[in-house]
Amino acid sequence: MNFPSTKVPWAAVTLLLLLLLPPALLSLGVDAQPLPDCCRQKTCSCRLYELLHGAGNHAAGILTLGKRRPGPPGLQGRLQRLLQANGNHAAGILTMGRRAGAELEPHPCSGRGCPTVTTTALAPRGGSGV
């Protein structure tokens, strides 16, 4: 049985080694860029670090990071509590925008027979809020 000759030219092997070996050796000697102290100590919000090391869909979070606008601090705080608490996160998050919009609506009723603003803003429509 005769196998065809598969000799590789010496110049091609040398060129390949010259192209691949130096970057590989340099990458071993280079340390990863250290994290800022605030991220290491968790004293500030390092959103990109949290996206990379947190749980969930990192790609979606990273791709939308530059497009997000900071919301009102109350809304952000409530979202953080919903995400970190136990329970049905989806229900709370999906109704959060509706509740935030309800708080900004003018209250049409004035007088003693009207419910308070907090109960109308937080109670779901058609329910008692309990």
Curated annotation (Swiss-Prot):
User: Which InterPro entries does UniProt cross-reference here?
Assistant: Orexin (IPR001704)
Which residues form each disulfide bond in the chain? C38-C44, C39-C46
PTM per UniProt? Specific enzymatic cleavages at paired basic residues yield the different active peptides.
User: What main location does UniProt list?
Assistant: endoplasmic reticulum
Cite the entry's keywords alphabetically: Amidation, Cleavage on pair of basic residues, Cytoplasmic vesicle, Disulfide bond, Endoplasmic reticulum, Neuropeptide, Pyrrolidone carboxylic acid, Signal, Synapse
Q: Which family would the database say this protein is a member of?
A: Belongs to the orexin family.
Q: Which GO terms describe its molecular function?
A: neuropeptide hormone activity; type 1 orexin receptor binding; type 2 orexin receptor binding
Which of the residues bear the PTM Leucine amide?
Answer: L65
Q: What is any one GO biological process for this UniProt entry?
A: negative regulation of potassium ion transport
Name-wise, this protein is Hypocretin neuropeptide precursor
Q: Which stretches are tagged as propeptide in the UniProt entry?
A: 97-130
Under Pfam families, the record lists:
Orexin
Q: What does this protein do?
A: Neuropeptides that play a significant role in the regulation of food intake and sleep-wakefulness, possibly by coordinating the complex behavioral and physiologic responses of these complementary homeostatic functions. A broader role in the homeostatic regulation of energy metabolism, autonomic function, hormonal balance and the regulation of body fluids, is also suggested.
Source organism (scientific name): Mus musculus
Q: In which tissues is it expressed?
A: Restricted to neuronal cell bodies of the dorsal and lateral hypothalamus.
Q: Which residues carry this modification: Pyrrolidone carboxylic acid?
A: Q33
